[in-house]
Each structure stands twice: as C-alpha cells, then as structure tokens.
From Swiss-Prot:
GO terms for molecular function: ubiquitin ligase complex scaffold activity; ubiquitin protein ligase binding. It comes from Rattus norvegicus (Rat). Residues 1357-1374 have a biased composition (Acidic residues). Pathway: Protein modification; protein ubiquitination. The gene is Cul7. Residues 1319-1335 have a biased composition (Basic and acidic residues). This is Cullin-7. Core component of the 3M and Cul7-RING(FBXW8) complexes, which mediate the ubiquitination and subsequent proteasomal degradation of target proteins. Core component of the 3M complex, a complex required to regulate microtubule dynamics and genome integrity. It is unclear how the 3M complex regulates microtubules, it could act by controlling the level of a microtubule stabilizer. The Cul7-RING(FBXW8) complex alone lacks ubiquitination activity and does not promote polyubiquitination and proteasomal degradation of p53/TP53. PROSITE patterns: CULLIN_2, DOC. Belongs to the cullin family.
Length: 1692
C-alpha cells in the first residue's frame, strides 16, 4: 500500500508526524471527460508524542480534493455503498426542528410585510432621527432572519435594498441594526454568508455609501466567513499595512472570484438556487464562466500584488530552464539595456587605481544625484540605479535609495558610477562599458542549446519532451490570448471597438467580429505584437505596470522585436513609451522654481519633480484654490512617486529641519482635499514613524508631525489603524514622556490610535485570510491543471507564484539584515569585518575595554544568530570577554543581551541566538583581551536572520497538496495493476505524462531552482516511490507485479530479437518502464557541494535528475533491486531444479548467468546495485539447494574450471576458446564467495588443483584464476598451495647451492689425498704402479655401473622422513661419475595439500635406484640442517614423507614418455625383466589395486610401450614390452601417458562425509550457544570454542578420516560456513546494533553421527604432519642405449 490502512481507511503521510485522512464527501460535479468527480475533504491529522493520532479541527486544517470513481474506490472505502458505488451527498434538509408548512407560510407573509414596512419607514425618516417603530421593525426582521427555514424569504432583492439603505444611513443605530440583520442572515452556513457578502459588495459604488464603521462591519463579517475556510499562518512574515478601503476592494474581488469558482465546481441545481442572491452581471452562461473567472482572478492578483507592495521589488525573470525536459526551442530574450551616462563625470576606467576613484566619487557626489552600481554587492546587483542619500564614517559609508529594491542600502564609494542629476544624464551606450556591465552581472540570456539526451546510458531521457506544433508557434495559446484580452477589457468602448476593427482587418473578413466573441479567436503572434505596441498609450500606470510584468508581454513584447530587421521602428516606439512629455515651460530645470527646502528633493526626482513644484505653488496661498490643486492631485494619483518621495523625506536626518517642516506643511494642506485621500499614504507611513521615533527630531517638527497625523487620522480612521499596526502608541508615549506632555493633540492622537486596536487586529486577520484564500485557489487551479491536463489560463498566475516563491533561492548567510556597521576606532578598516575573508581583520586602537562594534539592523529583523570570527594566532589581540548590548537608538544602547567568555582556541564565537525582540542597534563590546592585551583583532562578523518571505508557507502548502494528489493517484493506479497485471505496461506512459506535465508547469510558472526542486522531490516521493513499493510487493502467490513482468521479459527475450514481433513491442514497453523508474539514480556519488555564486531568478538550469538524484527516496532503489533479485532467484532456481544433474550443467549455467547479466544491463543500465542484486539472486537460488545437491554443483564448477585450465594448454584457436569459456565460468563462480557452499567448492577445487599441479606442473594461469576467484575460497587453501610451491622451489635452489658446496669440499679432500699418496709411493715405482691400476679399474666399474643405471626420475610425496641413511649409498652417489639426473624436491605442507595416505611411499629403498636414494637421503640431511639453522631445533622436528605422486620424463628409444611416478617405477622394472606380473608389482609397492591399475592403463594403451597379457595362473596379468614388429609406433616425439584426472562425485562417500562434518559442526555450534543462553557469544569466541571442542573430542568416524585424509581437519572457515548456514535457517540470531554477538534462536534437527559421540574430555588425534613432495630432473643429456634392446631411462 502507498500509505497506511487503518480501519479500512487510507491515510496519506504528508510529513513527519502528519498525515491526511478522507473524512467527508462535499459535492459532486461532471468532469471534463464526462465522468463524475467528487470533492472530498481530507483531514490533516497529527501524531502525538505518544504515537497516537489526534484529530485536529476539520475546519482548521483540511485539504479539499476532487477525486474520480477509481480514486475513491482505491482510497475512500467508507464512502462506497454496499453495491460499490459512491454514496452521493444527501440533498434532504434536516428534519429536526422543522416547522409546519402552514405556520411557515404565515411567517413568510409576515416577513414580506415587515420588509415593505421597513422600506417605507426608512424613506420617511431620511435626514431625521430614526423613529422607534423603524428600529423595532428591523429588530423583528433580525429575529425572523435567525430562523433557518425562513432563509429563502430573505433572498428577496428588496432585503438587499433595505440593508444597503440602512448601511448608508448616517444614524449609528440604523447601521448597527443593519449589522445585526446581516449577522442573523449569515449565521446559518458559510454559503449563505458568502452569498450575502457577495451581493452586498457587488452593489454599485458601495464604497461611497459606507463609512468606516459600516465597512468594518462588513469586513468583520467577511473575516468571520473566511476564518475557517482557508486557515493559514504567516508567522514570521511581515505583512504590509493595507488600509480598509483597499481591503474592501480586495474583499469584493475575492468574493467575486469565489462565486465564479463555485459556479465552475457546483451543480446546476445549486447554481439556480443561488441566482436570486447574485447580481445579474454575474449570472452569465456556463460557456463564459471560465473566461469571467480568469479575468476576475487576474484582477484580484493584480490588486493583491499592489496591496502587498510586491511590485516594489519586482525582480522579473528573463529566461527559464525546465526541470524535466531540456530548454524549449524558442524563448524570449531579456529586455535590451540602455546604459545612461553623464559626460560631465569620469568613469572608473579613467583612474589608475580603485582608491583614487573612490576619493573622486566621495568628493564629487552630492545628495540627490543618480548613481549606478558597478559590481555585485550582497543584495544589490551590478547595473542597479538609485539616488544618493547621505554618507558617514560607518562601513559601508554610502547610503543609496535603490530603484530595484525600493529601499536604501549602504555600499562602498568605489562601487558607484556617478550619473549626476537627472538633467545631466544622457541615453548613450558605450560599447566597452556595456561589455563590462554585462560581464559584471546585468545578465543576458544563456545561449540556445538544442535538446539532447542525458549522457548516461539510455538513448532517450526518462521524460520525453513534447514536439511543438509549428502552427501553434505561429499563434498565441488561449492562455496567452486571454492574458492579453485582460488588458483589452480595461479599454473604454471606443478603444475596444478600435481593437475589434484591427482584428477584423487583419483576419481579412474571415469572421464577423464583435467584442463578445474575441476570447474565442485564435490570434497570430504578429497581430498580438501589433496590439502590444498600441496598448501602452491607452492604459493607466497601474495597468501599464501589469502589462510590462505579464508573461505574454515578456515573451512577445517590443523588446523581443528589437533584433528583427523587418521591424526597424519598434525600438523607437518602445522608447516613446518611457518618454515624459513636457511643455515648453518645463524645459527649464524644475529646481529653479522650487523653494530652497525642496530644491534638493526636486532635483533628485528629475522631470517628475515639477509636480512637487506645482503642488507647492498651488498650496502656497492662504486659501488654496481647488481648481489649481485638483490637477496636481490627479497627476499624483497616476504617478505617486513624487508624493511618496515627499513623505519619505521625513526619514532623512534631523538636520534637514526646513525640509521636514515644508513637507509637513504641504501634507497638512493636502489632507483637506477629498481627492488626496486616494493617494497611497499608507505606503510611506513608516517614514512618519521613523521621524517620530528619532531622538534627534526637533520639537517643532514633532509638533507639526503630531498635527498632521491627527488631522489625517481624523479624516480617515483607516490611517489610525495603520499607525496602530506600526506601533505609534508606544512611540507617542515616549515622545510625551520626553517632552513632558507639552505637545498639543499628542494625547488625543494616542487615544485615537489605541481605540483602533480591534480594527488593526481585524485588518491583519483580513489580510491573512485573503492571501491564504488566494493561495488555496491557486493550489486548486494547479490541481485542476494536473487532473484535466488543460493549461492554466489565469492572467498573472506566474506573477503571483513568483512573488510567493521569492526568497526560496535567497542566500541566508548573506549579511543582508543590517544596514551598516560602525567601529570604535580605525573606521577605514571596518569593511574587513564583512569581507568574508578570514585572513583580514579589524584592529582597534585605544585603551583596554573601550573597543566596540555597532551594528545598525534593518527594521523588523529579528537576529537568529550573531557570530564573531576570531583567531587563536592573534594571541593577546584575541578577545577574552565580550558583552552584547541592544538599544532603540545609538544613545540608548544600555540593555545587556549576553556576555560571553571566549576560549583561547575558539574560532567562531556565537554571541546571540534566536532573539524574540527587534533591536535597532546592537553593540558588541570587547571588555577584555587574552593575556591582558590592550587592542583587539576581529576577523569577521556574521549576522543571520529569518527569511521574511512567503516561500516557506507556500512550499508547505504546495508540497502537501502535491503529495496528497499524487499519492491518491498512485494508489488508484496500483489498484488497477493489482486487478490486471497487464496494465503495468501502461504505467510508463502514465508516469511520463504526469512528470512531463510537472516539468512544463515548473518551466512556465516556478521562478527558480529551489521551488522547482521542492516540487520535483515531492512528486517523486508521492508518485514514483509508492508505485514502486506497490508493484514490487508480493501478492498472494508470492509474486509481485513487476516481478511477473520481468519474468515475462526474460522468457520472451529470444523472440524479442524480431522487431516485427509482439514480443519486441512488449520488451520495449518493459524497458521504457524500468528506464523511467531508475533513470535518475546516479552511477557515481554526487560531488561535494561548493559554495559558488549562482545567477538569480530563472537563469539557472532546472535539472530534475540532480534533485531526484540527491532527494530520491532510497526505498525506490531498494524495492526495485529486491524485486529484480527475487526474479533472478526464481529463474535460477528453476534452472537448478531441472538441470543440476546434466553433464553440460556448468556451460548452460554460465550461459544463463550471462543472459541475466545482459538483461540487467538492458533493463536498468550499468548500475552496480542491480548487478549486485542479480548476483545475490543467483546466490539465493544456490542456497536453496540441499547439501548434497549443492556439493554436486560446486564439484561441477571445480571440474569445469580444471578442464578449461588443462584445455587451454593446447594453444591455438581451441586454447583461446577454452580461455574464453574459463573467463565466463569464473564470472559466474564469483557469486559463491559469501555463501556456505564456498567451503565445499574450495574442497573440490583444492583436490583438482593439487592433482593438476603435481601431474602437469604450474603455469601463469593458476595465479590469474586465483586472483579472480580468490574470494570464493574462505580458507585460502589454493592460495596457500601456490605459496608453498614457491617456497619449495626456493628450497630447491638452496639445495643446489648446498650440493655444489659439498662437491667442492670433497674435491679438495680428494686432491689432498692424491698428493699424500704420490709422496708416499715416490720411491717404490712398481708398487705404486700396481696400486694405480687397481684404482683405475674401480673407477671404471663405477662409471659402467652408472651407465647401466637409469638416469633420473621425478617423485613427489608427503609424510615422514626415514631416520636411517646408509653411508655406502651416500658415498656411491657422491663419487658417481656418470651423468646424474636432475632431481627437484618439492617440500609441501600437508595443511594445504590434500594427499591421501594411500599415495604414501612406504618403502623408498625398494623403489628407487641406489644413487637416487642417496640424493633423497642427501636432501633429507640438507632439510634437517636448514631447520636447525633457522632456529627451529627447539620445536618438534618436522619429518619428510615421500609419496608416489609426481611426474617423470622417461626416454624410450627416440621417444620421451611423460609418465607419473608410479608409471616410471613400473617401467624401470622392465629394464632387466622381459615380463613382470601385476601381482608382484602390487606386492612390491604396496599400492592399492585401483592406483596401480590407473597407472597401467595408459601404458598398455595404443600409445603406450607395454602389453598386458591375461594368464589364468597369474591374477591381474603380466606386463611386457610391446614388440614393434607387431604394431609399429612413432619413433620420435613426446608421448603423454600420465593417467587422466580422476573426478570425485558428491553423491559418493566423499560428499556424504562432507555432510557429516558439517552436521557435526552444526551440532557443536548449537550446543555451545545453548549452553551460554541469552548472554550469547562473540563470533570469534564461538569459533575458538568450536575448534577447541573439535580438537579435544574423539576424531570423527574413522571412515571419514580415511576417505578425506587430513581433509577431516576442522578450520575456522568451516565453522564460519556453518554459522552462515544456521543464520540463514534462523537457528541463530544477532542484533542489528551488535552484529558480532550470536544467540541461539530456535532448535533445529541436526544430523548427528551415530558412530562416536563428541566428548570434549577425551584425547584428540596426533598432531598433523608436514608432507613433502619430490621432483627429479636430469642434469645431463639423455642416455641412448648402444645396444639393440630398448630400455627405459628417466629423462626427467
């Protein structure tokens, strides 16, 4: 399941401890496809600390979601009837409390008569005090209105007329009674309340008839109506102060939008019932409701953006990149920048250094001058323009009012370019400067890139981009046309008719047009561009700002046409839009006619400053004329910037007293004009509060300010509410306290502000409700867009989302929360505190304890963290004790916030965290330095604050709705798949459609990367992850849906090679699905995140794969790999069950393994996770085999490898083919490495490798094979075999040197002896001659004897060395003068080489020639001496045991016979005997018959030199040399007669003994763990105890020992293998937190041996022996017999 089923209801997880629960069916509608849809209320439930779920108020937190029948069937079981159909919402009213029909009729008659009487009485008392009967009538009507069955009577339009008359009455009691009636009417349900509000708000010019109290009454009713509809908290976000007049307008727009939305979503019956209450202009037909809703929603967004003042800091994105698909084929380019410059001022490039330029700017710049930013600095970007305000000694020192942000920001001197006053600036473009500005960060659109697939592994991306229709690119989409139509509707009738005529002319009479059918047209892009050229001259400033900010203008506006050659006039037309037309009188600078106090202000405004001059002139007389002031006011309403600049002049320093007084005088006079109340006073009211709070404000200015504010609030109490929201009450109280109450009207102003506390709360709540409701409607439109796949056609929809997402990509660690930083000394170094360079520092200069840093915070910013950066290397300059203080002004920093002791090794010192109060001034005082230092060094300062944006709130809501929508859809799709697995083939197209739709939405509406990534992550977690979980979960038959599909893919894989077959199409769909599910999984780890500067807005590339790579739930890959593993296990298990006995089992298994590996790459790509899952699946199948069957499989693997290694020796094409087969086999064998079967495989491989090395010798291939499959040998026995072989070869080299040394010593002795003999017999020549002849004869006899002996042999063996050595044989071999054979002895350890006792050479003296026996004895002496020299004499001496195993090269005529040691010994007997019986050979060698017969077989074959003759009296027959005349044989060449490899059978006694040994070890492990109980044992300790018990107890049955030889010995790898087996069976268990501890879990049935019991107290077997191997090689040329009789001579 996707979520959690509890009481048969589906719960969708929405976050940590948060989930949604389907609660109620609200309404029903017919969907876009004709099928019914149902709106379900999902409750938001939170999980408490104790794990229980507690329901939150359903009206407080819920989500309304439209669902289809299938989605309700899969998610909302309780809303289904017994027949499985959705239970429709009940249409019957409650019967409880219902009135009788007759009584109800009488009451309805009374209500109608009361309404007529109230209207008549109201008309009679116009202008007089309302009579008591009227009040009584209204009171009775209110009582009737509270009765719910009478609600229909009050829907008469006369009731609305009565309420309107009462609300517009000047008498307070009548207005109060009207409020009582409205509350009574709206007390029944939210729908009625909304209808009443809508009908009242849509009355014509209702604002003119409502005073402050009436408007507040309606606003309070609206707040009550919307409080529970869209609950949303904007805690931590600073909402602007919106006056009641603007709030009421927003309420009207909001109610109209909600009504139209209800008409779109409601039934026809409900709509007919509501029509009586709704104005006629809203009762349009269904066909135009969507258009009206889009226009109304666009109007609401437009007004809301202005009310929230979002348009102040409009940072419009210029380009976009998608998150699912590559960039679109065409995109708009950013608006061309016109670089303005004054030729009077020098640019920065004209100076030799930056410091020189900074000094020039400081000396030249004057307040009011325009400046431009040359480089990016924190939140100010290169190219931003602004007005210079002031400068001081702080850091940064320059304060500029920036146009891009709407507020002041402090920068450095060298960052500014002087543009001068407005009249000095020229529109010129310098090519060099333009390039520098673009490079500095103004930003241009990125170069166009054609789409190409993701360069990983697939031939197409997992989300295929839609192909654009060329015809569609030539016309506007309906959404784009409706956005342009929004502005056409704002034109008057004459201008509208002109647009209709233009369209008719362009379409060449194709349609007979009128204004009503314009929304249905398909408009070409060229025609739309013509319209956009003419619209700016016909729209007011507000609509013009909306036009420039809308999507269609940014995409097709005049700036896009600048580069087109066929439209050369476009640029001039565009520039004309921004040209301020002035008459001839305005050509003179307006500052010359302004008063001295306003001159600087007027100069800063440029040409628009003339409005202030005209306004001041009109108001300068004692009795200003309305006809002179009114035109100025109308102009200020259209262009309010001069008015706002005048009000914000109160925010300048207190030294500008004359300016303040002049501004207050003008503002005071403006209030007397009714038209002036339409100006945006609320937008600059914070400047008045700044002046009021400033401790340096002059008393006269304060008094004038009090007078002005009192007059303004008396004229409109809305501004008293705004002052209350700005905290004016406390500020006035402080001013009164400071001036001891000597300010006139200050007390009255404070009381008036205090009385508006309730209204201020109402305004804040209304602002929150409207904004929350708009967000919910936006989310609803996004949901409809997902469900219907229809484009969103609401104007400014992207604008609203852009403002909601503002701050999502803001860098939190930027120092954007403070205005400036001042220091106690060395102010020129203060900038080093904020340069983010740890190598620079600010150093103080003063007395100890007098150093401080003062931070001026931005208004309203709460410090989240204040950090001081220090360095221990500064020694005595490093701070030791720091005190942080806060204050409201620089003169009142006396509140201690924190005191911190700094440790000597600290680098970052956190001074403040999570403040709950705003402190305008924060001062850091360094009271003491380390080691008593005087001055201090500070490396840096970091100030972190919260993100005052709507993004966190909107992100939470967006992710909640997205998660709920897609998890519900995922559950419905999963239900379809569960009912019919074949529908899984359509899942790829479904997912592609959903992801492509989200990609297009992000590309069109989401402004930056973080917003897009948040949406993408939610989609993957809500849609892909649950689907993967469901389709990979096994059902009743233990097979998952995806597993079934993958099995089908593997079964029809061969047939899929035909592209025309159905199997090919099926396989293609399966691959599309698997590619889609795993495409975003990275092949490599993501690189570490590096803090780099990124472009703002939508210039960044949206790559969903990067997000989903980082944010992809691990459960997706885990479930997919687990499913693939189970599929592979099932496939391999079927193969093992059917083919494990076949002779070609291993080649077929390797082929199956290769197919699975290739299929894994086809389905999932070269991802290690799926390759590992495939191998684990094969391993799981092998683990399911019984022990004997698994032993047979492991023996087959070892046999196959042995055959391929031996076959590769033949070389040529056949040898290369064997190597290829060997490589494929080794790849498939690697899966045995972590399995229990690896021990059995090692046992067989060890046997075959020993026979191979001792029979044909070692090669490079042995080491290469071990290097590749080394992990498959837990005991590392094959590796140890090769290692001991190398050690033995080194001993042989030493033995050779030892022989040479012995020979040199004997030769020296021989020379000495000869010299002594020569001296002794010098006098007796005859006697000397006689002795010399005797010596020569003896030497010749030895040589002859040597010629008759065989020249060499090779033997290898193991066991104990014979203790006696005959000196005669040693002397004979030492003085042997013939060609000595080369003898190589290999000393091999019995711990690693498996040689059975039957191969031991029990009596070497009877089997070897005398001179070879001497060589062996000589080597034994050498080996004993080497042990004594190596310091091993204190240990028990290791003895040599010679064996029959080995190989030899025997010369027989011109042939070289390659034989084994036994065969060599047998051939040597035939040198002197014509025939020899097999029985005598067996008696002489004491070999078993099977060993001897194995050696005789090749010798008596067609290639062998012997014949075996059967005789009745001689058992076994007689061997003799074959006569060449009977059967000619080749006379030359090498003949291989070594017996073939003998392979073991796991079904024989060998395998059963292995099983017995494993059962014995299992029994020991279980017994030992049971003895330790719940305490358990460490795995190392358990292995030690098992080995100790094995050694102490009696040996396993003697049959086991005799058959396995020393293989019956127990090793740690054998114990670990048994532990793995028992863990897999569940007999043992271990905890996840302590995996090294093992515990006994449940009893199992263990096959215990019935021969002998394991008694730990009995004695064990003898210590293991050291086995050795002999190899003999000839040192001379092979001997060729000179006689005619052929004999055997050992060549090697």
């Amino acid at each position: 399941m996707v979520g959690e089923l509890r009481y048969r209801e589906f719960r969708v997880p929405l976050g940590p401890g948060l989930h949604a629960y389907p609660d109620e069916l609200i309404r029903q509608r017919v969907g876009h496809n004709g099928h019914p849809e149902y709106q379900i209320r999902w409750l938001i439930l939170r999980r408490g600390d104790d794990g229980d779920s507690s329901q939150v108020d359903c009206k407080a937190e819920h989500i309304l979601l439209w669902m289809t029948d299938d989605e309700i069937y899969a998610n909302c079981h309780k809303m289904l009837g017994e027949d499985g159909q959705v239970i429709r919402p009940s249409q019957e009213s409650a019967e409880a409390g219902a009135l009788d029909k007759s009584v109800l009729g009488e009451m309805e008659t009374d209500v109608k008569s009361l309404i007529q009487r109230a209207l008549r009485q109201l008309e009679e008392c116009v202008g007089a005090v309302p009579p008591a009967p009227l009040l009584h009538t209204v009171h009775v009507l209110s009582a009737y209105a509270s009765i719910e069955p009478l609600t229909g009577v009050f829907k008469d339009r006369r009731v609305l007329d009565l309420v309107m008359h009462m609300l517009s009455s000047p008498d307070y009691q009548i207005r109060w009674s009207a409020g009582r009636m409205i509350q009574a009417l709206s007390s029944h349900d939210a729908g009625t309340r909304t209808q009443i509000l809508l009908s009242l708000s849509q009355q014509e010019a209702i604002e003119k008839h409502l005073d402050f109290d009436s408007r507040c009454a309606l606003l309070a009713l609206f707040a009550q109506a919307t409080l529970t509809e869209h609950p949303m908290s904007f805690e931590g976000v600073q909402l602007p102060q919106v006056p009641g007049r603007l709030l009421f307008s927003l309420v009207k727009r909001y109610l109209c939008v909600t009504f139209l939305l209800d008409r779109l979503n409601g039934n026809a019956e409900d709509q007919d019932a509501q029509n009586n209450f709704i104005p006629e202009e809203l009762n349009a037909g269904r066909g135009r409701v969507e258009l009206e809703f889009s226009m109304a929603m666009g109007t609401l967004i437009s007004e809301l953006v202005q009310a929230m003042r979002w348009d102040w800091a409009s940072s419009r994105s210029e380009s976009s990149s998608p998150i699912f698909q590559p960039p679109p084929t065409e995109f708009f380019r950013p608006r061309a920048q016109r670089f303005r410059r004054s030729r009077r001022f020098r640019p920065r490039t004209a100076f030799a250094s930056v410091n020189t330029y900074a000094l020039y700017v400081r000396d030249t710049l004057r307040p009011g001058m325009r400046v431009r930013m040359l480089e990016d600095f924190e939140e100010i970007s290169a190219g931003d323009e602004g007005q210079f305000r002031q400068s001081n000694d702080g850091m940064p020192p320059v304060q500029v009012l920036w146009d891009s942000t709407g507020h002041t920001y402090w920068v450095h001197w060298h960052m500014l370019e002087i543009l001068g006053f407005e009249e000095d600036i020229e529109d010129v473009v310098d090519i060099d400067d333009q390039g520098a500005m673009v490079h500095g960060g103004l930003g241009v659109a990125p170069p166009f890139q054609h789409w190409k697939p993701i360069a990983q592994l697939f031939a197409e991306p997992y989300v295929v981009p839609e192909e654009e229709d060329r015809e569609e690119r030539e016309h506007l989409t309906q959404a784009e046309w409706w956005e342009l139509f929004f502005f056409i509707k704002k034109l008057n009738a004459e201008e509208r008719q002109h647009v209709v005529e233009l369209l008719q002319e362009f379409l060449e009479g194709e349609h007979v047009l009128d204004f009503e059918i314009l929304p249905e047209l398909t408009v070409p892009v060229e025609l739309a561009q013509d319209l956009m050229l003419s619209l700016p001259q016909q729209l007011d400033d507000s609509a013009l700002r909306d036009l420039f900010n809308c999507y269609v203008y940014r995409k097709y506006g005049p700036e896009v046409l600048v580069g087109k050659r066929n439209r050369p006039f476009v640029l001039d037309d565009q520039l004309n839009l921004f040209r301020i037309e002035t008459d001839s009188e305005a050509q003179d600078p307006p500052s010359q006619s302004a008063s001295p106090a306003l001159r600087q202000l007027v100069e800063g405004l440029g040409p628009s400053g003339k409005l202030l001059v005209d306004l001041e002139r009109a108001l300068s007389s004692e009795a200003p004329q309305e006809n002179e002031v009114k035109p100025c006011l109308l102009q200020l309403q259209e262009e309010p910037q001069p008015f706002l600049t005048l009000m914000r002049s109160l925010d300048t320093p207190a030294s500008n007293k004359a300016l303040h007084l002049t501004a207050l005088r003008i503002l005071m006079q403006l209030v007397n004009f009714p038209e002036a109340l339409l100006l945006p006073w609320h937008e600059a009211m914070d400047a008045c509060m700044t002046c009021l709070r400033s401790p340096n404000t002059d008393r006269e200015v304060l008094q004038e300010l009090i007078f002005f504010l009192h007059r303004l609030t008396s004229t409109s109490r809305d501004y008293a509410v705004i002052l209350n929201q700005l905290g004016a009450r406390d500020a006035i109280s402080k001013v009164l306290e400071k001036h001891r109450g000597k300010l006139e009207l200050a007390q009255e102003l404070r009381d008036m502000v205090f009385k508006c506390e309730k209204h201020a709360h109402l305004y804040r709540k209304l602002t929150t409700n409207i904004l929350g409701g708009c967000i919910q409607m936006v989310l609803g439109q996004i949901e409809d867009h997902r469900r219907t796949h229809r484009p969103i056609q609401i104007p400014f929809f992207d604008v609203f989302l852009r403002y909601l997402c503002q701050g999502s990509s803001a860098e939190v660690k930027k120092n954007k929360y403070w205005e400036k930083v001042e220091v106690s000394s060395n102010p020129h170094r203060a900038s080093r505190l904020t340069d983010r360079n740890a190598k620079t520092y600010w150093e103080s200069n003063g007395t100890a304890g007098s150093h401080f840093i003062t931070v001026h915070m931005r208004p309203g910013v709460l410090i989240r963290q204040l950090t001081l950066l220090v360095a221990g290397e500064d020694s005595s300059y490093m701070p030791a004790w720091v005190v942080v203080c806060g204050g409201d002004s620089i003169s009142s920093v006396n509140t201690e916030l924190n005191a911190v002791n700094v440790m000597p090794h600290a680098s970052r010192v956190i001074l403040l965290e999570n403040l709950t109060r705003f402190w305008p001034i924060v001062q850091i005082r360094i009271k003491r330095c380390q080691q008593g230092g005087i001055n201090t060094r500070i490396r840096g300062l970091e100030v972190l604050g919260p993100k005052p944006t709507f993004w966190p709130v909107f992100r939470e809501q967006l992710c909640r709705h997205t998660r709920l929508f897609y998890m519900v859809r995922a559950q419905a799709w999963s239900q379809d798949i569960a009912e019919d697995r074949r529908s899984l083939l359509h899942l790829s197209s479904r997912l592609n459609g959903a992801l492509r739709q989200e990609q297009n939405f992000a590309d069109r509406f989401l402004p930056d990367e973080e917003a897009a990534l948040a949406l993408s992550k939610t989609c993957w977690e809500a849609l892909v992850s649950p689907l993967v979980q469901n389709i990979t979960s096994p059902d009743e038959d233990s097979t998952s849906s995806l597993g079934w599909l993958l099995n089908q893919y593997l079964e029809c894989r061969e047939a899929a090679y035909n592209p025309q077959s159905r199997a090919a199409a099926f396989s293609s769909r399966v691959r599309h699905l698997t590619h889609l599910l795993v495409h975003v999984e990275p092949c490599e780890a993501a690189p570490p995140v590096v803090a780099i500067s990124q472009s703002k807005g939508r210039n960044r590339s949206h790559d969903w794969s990067s997000l989903t790579t980082r944010g992809l739930p691990s459960s997706i890959m885990r479930n997919l790999t687990r499913c693939w593993r189970s599929v592979v296990e099932e496939q391999v298990n079927k193969f093992l069950t059917s083919s494990w006995k076949d002779d070609d089992f291993v080649p077929r298994y390797c082929e199956r393994y290769y197919i699975l590996q290739k299929s894994s790459s086809e389905l999932f790509g070269p991802r290690a996770a799926f390759l590992l899952a495939m191998r684990n699946g094969c391993a799981d199948a092998l683990l399911r085999l019984p022990f004997l069957r698994a032993a047979h499989v492991s023996e087959q693997f070892a046999r196959h490898i042995d055959q391929r290694i031996q076959g590769s020796r033949m070389g040529g094409a056949r040898g290369m083919e064997m190597l290829a087969q060997l490589q494929r086999c080794l790849e498939s064998v690697l899966i045995l490495s972590p399995l229990e079967i690896a021990t059995t495989f090692e046992h067989y491989y060890q046997h075959y490798m020993a026979d191979r090395l001792l029979s044909v010798g070692s090669s490079w291939l042995e080491g290469a094979v071990l290097e590749q499959i080394g992990p498959c040998f837990p005991g590392r026995l094959p590796q140890q075999m090769l290692q001991t072989l190398n050690i033995s070869e080194e001993l042989q080299r030493r033995f050779h040197v030892y022989q040479l040394q012995q020979l040199d010593q004997e030769l020296l002795k021989l020379e000495d002896t000869e010299k002594k003999i020569q001296v002794a017999h010098e006098d007796s020549g005859k006697e000397h001659k006689s002795k010399k002849e005797d010596a020569a004869g003896e030497t010749a006899a030895v040589a002859m004897a040597d010629e008759e002996e065989e020249e060499g042999k090779k033997e290898e063996g193991e066991e104990e060395e014979g203790e006696g050595e005959e000196e005669l044989e040693e002397e004979e071999e030492r003085y042997y003068e013939g060609t000595m054979p080369e003898v190589c002895v290999l000393v091999l350890s019995p711990r690693f080489w498996p040689v059975a006792s039957v191969c031991h050479m029990l009596n070497p003296t009877t089997c070897l020639p005398s001179y070879l026996r001497g060589t062996i004895n000589h080597y034994s002496n050498f080996y004993s001496k080497s042990q004594s020299h190596s310091g091993l004499e204190k240990e028990s001496p290791r003895q040599l045991q010679w064996t029959w195993q080995g190989r030899a090269e025997v010369q027989f005529g011109d042939q070289i016979l390659h034989v084994s040691t036994v065969q060599m010994w047998l051939l040597l007997h035939l040198n002197h005997l014509k025939a020899v019986s097999v029985e005598s050979l067996q008696a002489l060698s004491e070999l078993p018959p099977e060993v001897l017969n194995k050696a005789i077989g090749p010798l008596t074959s067609s290639r062998g030199p012997l014949d075996l003759q059967e005789q009745k009296n001689i058992p076994g027959g007689v061997l003799k040399i074959r006569d060449d005349s009977e059967e000619p044989r080749p006379r030359r060449g090498n003949v291989w007669l070594i017996p073939p490899q003998t392979y073991l059978k796991a079904e024989d006694e060998e395998g059963r003994n292995l099983e017995k040994r494993r059962n014995l070890l299992n029994c020991l492990v279980v017994r030992i763990l049971k003895a330790h109980g719940d305490e358990g044992l460490h795995i190392d300790q358990l292995v030690h105890l098992v080995l100790e018990a094995w050694e102490k107890g009696p040996c396993p049955p003697r049959g086991l020992v005799s058959s396995l030889g020393r293989g019956a010995a127990c090793r740690s790898s054998d114990v670990l293998s048994c532990i793995l087996h028992l863990l897999g069976k569940g007999t043992l268990r271990r905890h996840d937190d302590r995996p090294q501890m093992l515990f006994y879990a449940v009893p199992i049935t263990v096959m215990e041996p019935h021969t002998e019991s394991l008694n730990p107290g009995s004695s064990g077997p003898n210590p293991p022996l050291t086995f050795h191997t002999l190899q003999i090689r000839s040192r001379g040329v092979p001997y060729a017999s000179c006689t005619g009789t052929q004999t055997f001579s050992t060549f090697r």
